[in-house]
A protein has these predicted regions:
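Short alpha-helical segments that sit at the start of domains
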Residues: 1-23
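Short amphipathic alpha-helical interface segments
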Residues: 19-34
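A short acidic, leucine-rich amphipathic alpha-helix
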Residues: 38-43
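Short amphipathic alpha-helical interaction segments
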Residues: 44-58
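A short, conserved structural fragment
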Residues: 58-68
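Basic, amphipathic "hinge/linker" alpha-helix immediately C-terminal to the N-terminal HTH DNA-binding motif
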Residues: 68-81
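Long, charged amphipathic helices and adjacent flexible linkers at domain junctions
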Residues: 87-101
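Mid-protein regulatory/catalytic core that forms ligand/cofactor-binding pockets
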Residues: 98-198
Length: 200
């Protein structure tokens, strides 16, 4: 549904926001009642784009507006529950030899290993969102492996792999994406954009 709402051919003005922005908006609105101006600032979108985004969510009956601001409807809460069921730990990741930016953010996507091809799709999505790049790991037989070769993390980086596993606590066939950027915001948005590729 979120992908359809973000498509340019949807009814109404051509949106200048993405499926990722819609997902983030639902997460934000699900955590607090929020007004348009504050939501605009949180999303990093202009006032016009935020107004259109809110209109699309209203038309889809995913949110409603009260005196306290935007809040999720039952349908909106259902979508948020689906997102939470697919996404696991989200965390700032320390700079290391495997990271690709001064700031790094990781996210776990549950049970999505079979959707990973080469990892390039995730990297490209992260870059389009403003990150420098992204590194993707999948969990196979209890170990972190790196596509496309599915080879184990090099021995010299085993301590890093161990720290990642302790931080994200992945299960078999989970995916961990770590995006790096020139700011925490770009790193987080890159990781989320890469994760969305696996949920489309």
């Amino acid at each position: 549904m979120l992908k359809e709402l973000a498509m340019e051919k949807a009814a109404g003005p051509t949106p200048s926001f993405t499926q990722l922005d819609l997902g983030r908006a639902i997460e934000i609105i699900g955590s607090e009642h929020i007004g348009r101006n504050k939501l605009s600032a949180r999303l990093g979108l202009g006032e016009g784009a935020t107004r259109t985004l809110i209109d699309r969510l209203l038309d889809a009956r995913l949110i409603k507006i009260s005196k306290l601001g935007c809040e999720l409807t039952r349908s909106g809460q259902s979508i948020l529950n689906e997102l939470n069921a697919k996404l696991g730990t989200k965390r700032i990741v320390a700079l290391s030899s495997i990271t690709v930016g001064n700031y790094n953010f990781g996210i776990l996507v549950k049970g999505a290993a079979n959707r990973i091809k080469s990892g390039i799709e995730q990297r490209d999505a992260a870059v389009r969102a403003g990150a420098n790049g992204a590194v993707t790991f999948v969990v196979k037989h209890g170990e972190l492996v790196m596509p496309p070769s599915a080879g184990s993390v090099p021995r010299r980086q085993e301590n890093i792999a161990r720290a990642i596993k302790e931080t994200f606590e992945p299960q078999e066939n989970d995916v961990i994406i770590i995006a790096g950027g020139d700011s925490e915001q770009y790193a987080e948005e890159g990781a989320m954009a890469a994760a969305w590729v696996l949920m489309e």
